[in-house]
Amino acid sequence: MNKTIQTTLQLFLGALILLNISSCQKQEKPVKFIIASDFHAPDIPDGKERLASFIEAAHKEKADFIIELGDFCRLDSASQVYHELWNSFPKDKYHVIGNHDMDQYTPEEYVKGMNMPGRYYSFDKGDFHFIVLDGNNLYDGKEYRHYAKANYYVNPEYRAFIDPEQMEWLKKDLASTNKRCILFSHQSIDTFVKNGKDVRQILENENERAGFKKIVLAFSGHNHSNYSKVINGITYIQINSASYVWIDQPSKTELRYPEEVNKQYPLLGYSITYDRP
């Protein structure tokens, strides 16, 4: 007999997310994690302070793990402070590859430098199965190529694909667990990933095969905006940047920062930083 299950995920979004799901499954134990996206920490004056406040919140909330959804920081010595801050959290920590993480590196270099298990991977926490996807692939109609060292500044129609190998892995990974599943990606599979419809079909097919609402949530970043939507029973949540909104026009940054700061951080010229993360 069906009963209502209350699945609780506590997120660093200024809200407690409660999902009521009809299922025959047992009631899951709560999992608490702190999530952020698009720090762009080396590119803004207070990147260290923003990341520090995130880590402080994770400690205060006694999170089970933390995760960032890409466009985090670089691998050079100047970014060492961000790596040290991130690694100061004593529990599990996870990264997602963002497009700008591929501005100076190959995926192999970045995965190794960030101590990631792979460019896409999965892990379990309590009664939940979490999946990290990688949408940083080019496809010109002939072949798939991963973003690497800024090679993706080409026709926008070629960008943001999930490669076939990853799609097959996703099918097998979903089928291998009976836990409820939550996905993370930099680009949104509901709007931005070019073959997102195919990815969503995999998720929906698995829900149908499993006979219960197995895939419940998919988080993304990249667009520096907030929204949530439901597509065929699966909730998609976009996480805003922890740092700024890109406006793609002069932002009058000279009214907000001194000249030497604007010279050091040219990104400020076309963006508006948030007061706090």
Q: What is each PLM-predicted segment?
A:
Residues 78-171, 175-176, 198-215, 225, ...:
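Extended active-site neighborhood of metal-dependent phosphoesterases/phosphodiesterases
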Residues 1-29, 207-208:
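Bacterial Sec-dependent N-terminal signal peptides
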Residues 38, 70-71, 98-99, 186, ...:
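Active-site glycine-centered loops adjacent to acidic/histidine catalytic or metal-binding residues
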Residues 33, 66, 130, 181-182:
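Hydrophobic beta-strand anchors of alpha/beta hydrolase catalytic cores
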